[in-house]
Regions:
Chain A
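Basic amphipathic alpha-helical segments that dock to polyanions
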Residues: 54, 58-61
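C-terminal regulatory/oligomerization modules of transcriptional regulators
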Residues: 1-7, 63, 68, 82-122
DNA sequence: GACCCCACTTACTTCTTGGTAAGTACCCCA
DNA sequence: TGGGGTACTTACCAAGAAGTAAGTGGGGTC
């Protein structure tokens, strides 16, 4: 995702900057409805993400105050990730866009791979 | 902007793929409310965009059936860009996200430049 | 004839993002 | 003592998105 230059010229610009990483909306989705997840849980829920990138995006979301990171100093210690209220409001704002994408996902995919076939290649 | 791998795992993934270029939401905004614009108009309305990137993003939006490109074979010939109905529905779906970004733009900007000052540097 | 506008196209470079793979440090269990 | 789990960090590399700059080919204007 391409970062917009600051200052943002409009709200969408800013919002997409927050949400534009390859795995960020998926992380937001995984933490929806007040869900709490550990680092290793998220790894398992996002097949294909590397540890490096997952941490990177979690840190960025935390820096944006969208995700809350809490360390539990128990034995053994662990870390829990959840949405902040701010993150929750972001997820709400994303819902119409998600619905649009879901509604048109076939069209979008088709336009994105004009060289491929939808039928099985023999 | 980072492209998601196909097939998309959720609608947001797909939508952000359509809208994720650096200038795309700005183009969508410029063409909002049935507005029609020429290439040169858009260049002027998006200060900082290069011709190469503007055309590239217009072509991608057209390939996604979000933007309509019409050539007028008059003398002199020219080209007009406008939103399709599909693009219009996308803009509608983007509005809540835009409102969220606008509401929190100060917070987002502040979190995005922790090393800079908001007061003028002397 | 020189210059501007329109709508691009092309070649080259840089910068950012993400991916790969390995290492760290600590704990528990058998 | 070897293996597994937790939560990272680090270094290196590749792909792609965007930026720069120049060229194209038409027309119209002074």
């Amino acid at each position: 995702m391409v970062k917009s230059k600051l200052p943002y010229v409009c709200g969408i610009d800013a919002a997409i900057d927050v949400v534009g990483g390859k795995w960020k909306v998926l992380i937001l989705w995984a933490l929806d409805h007040g869900t709490t997840r550990r680092f290793a849980d998220l790894r398992r829920e996002l097949p294909g993400v590397s540890e490096k990138v997952l941490i990177q995006q979690l840190r960025e979301l935390a820096a944006d105050e969208v995700v809350h990171r809490e360390v539990f100093h128990e034995v053994p210690p662990h870390v829990e990730y959840s949405l902040t209220e701010f993150g929750d409001s972001l997820n709400e704002a994303l819902r119409p866009l998600g619905a649009w994408g879901r509604r048109h996902i076939k069209t979008i995919e088709a336009n994105r791979r004009p060289a491929e076939f939808d039928i099985a290649t023999g």
